[in-house]
Structures are given as structure tokens and as C-alpha cells.
């Protein structure tokens, strides 16, 4: 599947199929330095994903389990050892698009939109404000 990489100020778009592995790395320092939900808080059940600690996200269809919560702008992951056996849920703390030129806090509507896109095998949109880098996509 093709991966389209845009400049950092733009979005990264990837067309993913259910069952594909998405390998990403995130520089958490962006969220730590620029604020955002969870930034600076103590999260004993989370791990920090950095360039030296990449993780693969398995795209699956079905109901999203809120136990596993992936934040694109920080990539917090509950129970990372079980990530391959769960459904990834994406949360955007701030997004920009043609309808919302200024970054806005994520609403349930955006979560629903992202979930529907993954379920329907449509385009998955990642906001690279936290310096998200798509490394590989494989089936």
C-alpha cells in the first residue's frame, strides 16, 4: 500500500487494510514541550515511544477497546506487550483541516470518524504535529 509523506506542517495519509502492520515512531518531546492532554502527567500504565523505541500497530476492524488508547500526538499505549492482540484506537488531541484551520481539542466526533475510517478500510489520517514518522506498512 502506498504511503504519502507530507512536510511536517501537513498531514501524513496512509491507506491501510485491516490486518496490516503500521510501524511508526514518535518524538514525544513535542507533546511534552507544547502541552496536550496527558502531557506532564504521571501515567504508570503507559510507555513512551521514541525513535529508539518504535512500535508496530496492527490495524483491525471491529469495536474499539478503550483499554488500548493510542494518542497520535504522544502515542501512549496501554499494556504494550499486548498491542498485537488488540484493536488500536486513535485519539487526536489537536487537529487541523479545511473546516477547522486552528487546532481544536479532539471531540468524540473525530474519534468516531477515525474509527469508521479504519473499519471501512479507508484512509487513516495521522497529524504529524508530534513528529510522527511512518516507517513501513506491510501486509
What function would you assign to each model-found segment?
Residues 1-139:
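Surface-exposed, low-hydrophobicity beta-strand/loop segments enriched in small/polar/acidic residues
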Amino acid at each position: 500500500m502506498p504511503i504519502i509523506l507530507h512536510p511536517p506542517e501537513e498531514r501524513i495519509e496512509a491507506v491501510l487494510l485491516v490486518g496490516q502492520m503500521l510501524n511508526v515512531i514518535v518524538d514525544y518531546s513535542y507533546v511534552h514541550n507544547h502541552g496536550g492532554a496527558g502531557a506532564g502527567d504521571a501515567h504508570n500504565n503507559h510507555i513512551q515511544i521514541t525513535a529508539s523505541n518504535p512500535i508496530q500497530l496492527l490495524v483491525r476492524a471491529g469495536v474499539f477497546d478503550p483499554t488500548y488508547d493510542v494518542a497520535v500526538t504522544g502515542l501512549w499505549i496501554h499494556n504494550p506487550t499486548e498491542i498485537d492482540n488488540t484493536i488500536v484506537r486513535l485519539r487526536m488531541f489537536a487537529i487541523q483541516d479545511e473546516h477547522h484551520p486552528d487546532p481544536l481539542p479532539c471531540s468524540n466526533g473525530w474519534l468516531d470518524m477515525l474509527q469508521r475510517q479504519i473499519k471501512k478500510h479507508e484512509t487513516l489520517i495521522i497529524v504529524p504535529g508530534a513528529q510522527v514518522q511512518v516507517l513501513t506498512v506491510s501486509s
